[in-house]
């Protein structure tokens, strides 16, 4: 029996919850759907008796991506829908070639969260039929239809040992470069072909001054608990440890999703995180803290024209406001995140149904595309997954060959980070299913 939809994900935290919501809706409509990770071993069944009718990808930038993500997973297929997870870009990225797709990737269906992204893609040569606006599925969990999906403030505070009576302020950090050494920044710059030294300096200065603001404010306001939601790459930060030791109402917490902290928080501040869109979709406001300007080539374009708090006094004044105005113009944020009265997962499922039932809109694997099967990757993935199942790290197994050990260990790290256990999947399904079943009737 063939499979109707195969959904591929890359980053678990970013994508899996939304993919599962979409899968459950498709199953509710009577279709078959499965979710797999991009680095899962290739399986014969997806090329033969269980070949999917529609391939739903997480990214699809060029012909090599079509080959790697589609051809090497299921063979030939012209029904390719990209969930297009990277849409919050800087102005430099929006103008460049990579994020506007090349080759036959322009013939795939590149879904768009809002009209501004669709217009940009059309300005760069895509046809309107291939860049439909669906809204952002991950934002649906913040809609009124999903009320009760996240814990309330009291339950969340008790889970993390915070006083629910206190004012809960959430800071969403993006200081990923602040904890990197000069040598690490240099190495990253050489690898990417871009000099990140200036932006790393902006990270450090911004973090230092922001923490100074928090230190002063928390000393004056013991009734406020500030939860510092660190960036995933913010590690080994003595500044955070020192402030947490000095101020008992400063808490560095990474556990829990950023969405549930947004829903629970009494007030929110942010630097340059794209989570500002989630704040808006949750019906809340926030303060944009910018002690120093951010280089435009790194600043998400959604922040353009925003209202920044650049001094401690402006930050403190914002904290005193009961309902501060949202710092980004409505037309800008809704241009990137379509505010349809209908949830995005339903609109996305509608699109997938159309793609399934109608002839292919285009030919991504037609002229201009040359398929090739990557046998090295095929055997490497099976080998690494075997080591992962046996809990054997490649650097220990291949100690006799540094090059092989490093190569296999890198893939092993990706596999380990993306792994979702069957128990975790069941728990997420049980949590999401009631909202799908109670939603729009099929």
Predicted features by range, described:
Residues 227-277, 282:
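Donor nucleotide-activated moiety binding/catalytic core segment of transferases
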Residues 108, 131, 249-251, 306-307:
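Short, conserved active-site loop motifs that form the nucleotide-linked donor/cofactor pocket
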Residues 317, 323-442:
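C-terminal amphipathic helix plus adjacent low-complexity
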Residues 4-150, 174, 234, 276:
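Active-site and donor-binding regions of nucleotide-sugar-utilizing enzymes
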Residues 53-55, 105-110, 225-226, 264-267, ...:
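Short active-site oxyanion
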Residues 147-242:
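Conserved catalytic-core segment of nucleotide-activated headgroup transferases in glycan assembly
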Residues 242-245, 267, 274-342:
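Catalytic binding pocket for nucleotide-activated donors in carbohydrate/polymer assembly enzymes
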Residues 44-50, 158-160, 318-322:
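Short amphipathic alpha-helix with an adjacent loop that forms part of the alpha/beta core around
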């Amino acid at each position: 029996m063939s499979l109707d939809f195969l959904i591929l994900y890359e980053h678990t935290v970013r994508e899996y919850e939304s993919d599962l919501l979409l899968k459950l809706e498709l199953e509710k409509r009577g279709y078959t759907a499965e979710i797999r990770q991009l680095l899962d071993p290739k399986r014969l069944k997806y090329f033969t008796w269980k070949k999917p009718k529609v391939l739903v990808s997480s990214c699809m930038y060029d012909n090599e991506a079509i080959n790697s993500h589609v051809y090497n997973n299921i063979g030939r297929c012209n029904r390719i829908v990209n969930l297009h997870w990277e849409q919050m870009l800087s102005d430099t990225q929006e103008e460049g070639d990579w994020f506007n797709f090349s080759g036959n990737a322009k013939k795939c269906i590149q879904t768009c969260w809002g009209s501004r992204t669709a217009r940009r893609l059309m300005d760069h040569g895509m046809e309107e039929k291939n860049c439909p606006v669906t809204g952002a599925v991950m934002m649906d969990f913040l809609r009124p239809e999903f009320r009760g999906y996240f814990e309330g403030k009291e339950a969340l505070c008790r889970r993390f040992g915070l006083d629910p009576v206190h004012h809960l302020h959430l800071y969403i950090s993006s200081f990923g470069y602040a904890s990197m050494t000069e040598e690490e920044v240099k190495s990253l710059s050489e690898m990417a072909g871009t000099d990140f030294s200036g932006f790393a300096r902006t990270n450090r200065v911004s973090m230092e001054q922001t923490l100074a603001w928090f230190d002063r404010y928390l000393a004056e306001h013991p009734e406020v608990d500030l939860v510092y939601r660190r960036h995933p790459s913010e590690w080994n930060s003595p500044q955070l440890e020192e402030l947490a030791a000095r101020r008992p109402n400063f808490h560095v917490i990474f556990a829990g999703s950023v969405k549930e902290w947004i829903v629970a928080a009494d007030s929110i501040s942010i630097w340059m995180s794209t989570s500002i869109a989630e704040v808006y979709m949750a019906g809340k406001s926030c303060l944009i803290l910018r002690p120093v300007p951010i280089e435009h080539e790194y600043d998400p374009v959604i922040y353009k024209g925003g209202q920044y708090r650049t001094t401690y006094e402006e930050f403190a004044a914002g904290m005193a406001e009961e309902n501060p105005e949202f710092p980004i113009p409505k037309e800008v944020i809704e241009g990137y995140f379509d505010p349809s009265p209908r949830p995005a997962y339903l609109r996305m499922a509608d699109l997938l149904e159309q793609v399934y039932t109608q002839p292919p809109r285009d030919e991504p694997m037609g002229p201009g595309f040359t398929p090739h099967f990557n046998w090295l990757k095929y055997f490497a993935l099976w080998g690494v997954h075997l080591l992962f199942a046996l809990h054997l790290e490649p650097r220990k197994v291949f100690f006799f060959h540094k090059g092989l050990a490093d190569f296999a260990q890198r893939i092993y790290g990706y596999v380990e980070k993306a792994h979702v256990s069957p128990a975790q999947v069941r728990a997420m399904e049980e949590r999401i299913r009631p909202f799908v079943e109670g939603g729009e009737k099929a």
